[in-house]
From Swiss-Prot:
Organism: Mycoplasmoides gallisepticum (strain R(low / passage 15 / clone 2)) (Mycoplasma gallisepticum)
Listed GO biological process terms: translation
Protein name in the entry: Large ribosomal subunit protein bL32
Pfam family, one: Ribosomal_L32p
Domain of life: Bacteria
Positions in coiled-coil regions: none
Keyword Ribonucleoprotein: yes
Length: 57
């Protein structure tokens, strides 16, 4: 097992952990049906950017 030779400072520890944050999911409201949808994805009603992409489920 690896054992550290010196104690790491808070600054080095925090710099290492700077990329560990969870990504925030952007949520928008569909202009066509009013349901919540994730950004840059088609809604469940079949609309994307006011264009019909698929048939409604």
């Amino acid at each position: 097992m690896a054992v550290q030779q010196r104690r790491s400072s808070k600054h080095r520890r925090d710099k290492r952990r700077s990329h560990d944050a969870l990504a925030v999911n952007l949520i928008n409201v569909c202009k066509h049906c009013g349901k919540f949808k994730r950004a840059h994805r088609a809604c469940s009603c079949g609309m994307y950017n006011e264009l019909r992409i698929t048939k409604a489920k």
